[in-house]
Amino acid sequence: LEVVSGGKAIYRVVYREGGTAAELEAARAVAKTLGRICSAEVTLASDILMPGQEYPAEGYDILVGYTGYPESRRAYEELSYGSYSVSADGGRIVLAARGDNEISRTTDEFLSLLTVTGKGDECRVVFPSDAVRRGTLSDEAAALPMISGGEYDSVYSTGDGAYMVVVKKADADISTAYLAALAEAGFEERIRHTDEKNVFCSFEGKGLTVYTAFCDKTLRVIVQKGSLSDIMFPDRAPAAGSTEPLVSFVGLAYDTKNNGSLYKNGLSLIWRLSDGSFMIADGGGQNATHAKLVYDELCRLAPDKNNIRISAWFITHAHIDHAGVFHMFTQSYRDRVKLDRLICNIPTNAYLQGLTDDSTESSAVAMSDTIHSDIRKWQGLEVIKAHPGHKYYIAGAEIAVYTTADMLYPALEATTANSTSVVFGVTVDGKKLLVTGDAGADACGAAVAVWGRALKSDAMTVIHHGLRGATTQFYSFVNPETVLWPSALVLFEDTRSRSYNAYLLNS
């Protein structure tokens, strides 16, 4: 197939309108590379159709991703999750992949198959019509049975070895059928949490864990290596003890000039559990002062300050004022305490780098790298990737996960890393404290759509220190009696009149 002839591009590159960021990036890469080869512009077009239009039966097109063209759909029917193919179908060239990493691979495979001769007006580029390249990059995703029905979106690499299949326009029948398909494929259902409109299940099998979430007319299936944590099972979790449980909202050393050494904001929560162990949410910024505040509070509250055990440390998101203290604490205090578990859901660096509406995202990538480096310094540390619908049980405390970055796919729907915050509720002695991190308006909307009245809490941390991101709608569903405001007084005074903050203060 003659892609370039006489120095002019014969073929155009077509991507899926409304497709994934990875698909668009791959299409752009193909068009840009071909343009560089032939020193001419290559047309890049979406597959969108106007009312009454149909795709032409023939054309000189390089189809990238899950386009609406029949040739693309035929190629995808042959692919398992986590796989890719490059081939010709008639006169069209098809780059197909069930995965964001996989679609990137198709561009390399396609370009490697091209034969280029001549330069300038003599340039000729040929793709062999009988060529077929296939492969699988994720054996974990490939182990999943295919979902029948709904509107397939993509397979996403969501960080820490997890892969997520997203199918939109799903219904209860599609979800039920897929749960049966997982069982038939050799996965054993171990946990199911349901309410009037949502179904969350956890499976084990083949050395993998599979989480399914049917909510808001979308079916998400997440697979990763490993087994389910003991704290997901009430009868296997740490038992309650006789120590009086409490929660401490730790004051941080705030710098009103915000000069980078300390902060106007941050979040540090410590629960003492009934077995004498602790849970921590975030902890504060990347400085020795905040790390010492956390350690000193643990010592003050511990039944035995020489035997401090942290049952779980939650990191809401990879921003330095929340997660930075984990690095400093690891550096200074890991030999003085026992840390059993780290619970978080940090997207891939590629995802974080794709967030364009926040000048801090380069630091989010650095913070993520630092966290993962620090994880390796703790002996025997269990790392749990939190997913919506997860419940954990630790010494009389019940933790429910409401939103994570998982809820913001397809595509890069989050505008900042703030919206990737893990939002979770901790219930002790019948009282629930909702931890919101820096969740943005998009995450708030997803939480309300899925959870509604289940968000009701006795207390909550105000979103993003009172800065942008919160919505009055979200706060109306939480409807707390007590609000914890993790910010310096000067920031509180500057933001208290904002509509969502005024709602909390006046309701």
Go through each PLM region and give its residues.
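Binuclear metal-ion centers of metallo-dependent hydrolases, dominated by the metallo-beta-lactamase
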Residues: R341-I343, P347-L408, A414-N418, T482, ...
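Core dinuclear metal-dependent hydrolase active-site scaffold
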Residues: D230-I308, K385-K456
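Active-site metal-binding motif and surrounding structural segment of the metallo-beta-lactamase
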Residues: G276, A288-P347, V450-L467, N479-L484
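Solvent-exposed alpha-helical segments and adjacent loops
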Residues: L1-T136
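Active-site environment of divalent metal-dependent phosphoester hydrolases
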Residues: N265, N287-A288, A318-G324, N349-L352, ...
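Structural recognition of the beta-strand scaffold that forms the well-ordered cores
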Residues: V14, D61-V64, I93-A96, I270-R272, ...
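Amphipathic alpha-helical segments
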Residues: A21-I37, K169-I191
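Compositionally biased P/S/T/G-rich terminal and signal peptide-adjacent segments
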Residues: L1-R12, S129-K168, I222-I231
